[in-house]
Amino acid sequence: IRELVLHHVGGYLKIAPEHTEQGPLSKMMKPGIGTYDRFRQMFEQFSREAGKEQFLIPYFIAAHPGTTDEDMLNLALWLKKSGFRADQVQAFYPSPMATATAMYHTGLNPLKGIHRDQRGEKVDTVKGERRRRLHKAFLRYHDPNNWPLLRETLKRMGRADLIGNGKHHLIPAFQPRTDGSYSSPRRAHSTSSPLKGGLLTRHTGLPPCGSPQEKKESKQWGDRRKGKSA
């Protein structure tokens, strides 16, 4: 990590903890959020020792198979405690040849073996517009447009204690006038450079749409297709 910090980071480093809860993380075969915390501590320590001001930009995902509403609530609480605010939000979408896609369509965990009886491990899949919108709303807990849905959900979950105007509350009790707008996750990020405390979300392993990396890979793909046609 010291080598990475000293010679291979240009101010920002993107890293993908994906989630804080074991439900979705186990389906992704990802380590727990404690691994990210330890990496962050070493990253910040070595950056200070090198006299550099560098930041981690974490990726998180909404609506991945194996994610419950409680998981998203816990992620939102962790994000607020850590001082992170998502700019654009993208949710999981099934894509070909992905293990998560098999989970999405079957409701079973192929990592544990597929069985139609009680031996099969059932996987909670996030389907339906309202529930998918809810999981996105938890990632953007700071957006006033999401507060009505989050208030309703928190009351249903028996967590009305998280509604209020204190620092320990997730969302305020009052509702300001909003236009109800939502930024499309397919648009480029609204800032040219990530801000401290910012984070990114994704639905696949692809780079953010419109990013320099995405444009570069798209050009390389186009060049390969032209070469094959020739």
Predicted segments with their positions:
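C-terminal low-complexity, glycine/proline- and small-hydrophobic-enriched intrinsically disordered tails
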Residues: 72-86, 90-145, 154-155
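Amphipathic alpha-helical packing elements
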Residues: 137-180
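Acidic, low-complexity intrinsically disordered tails
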Residues: 116, 172-230
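A glycine-rich phosphate-binding loop feature that marks nucleotide/adenosyl-phosphate handling sites
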Residues: 56-63, 91-98, 170-171
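Acidic/polar loop patches that form or flank catalytic/metal-binding clefts of enzymes
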Residues: 52-57, 85-91, 162-163
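A structural motif
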Residues: 9-10, 84, 159
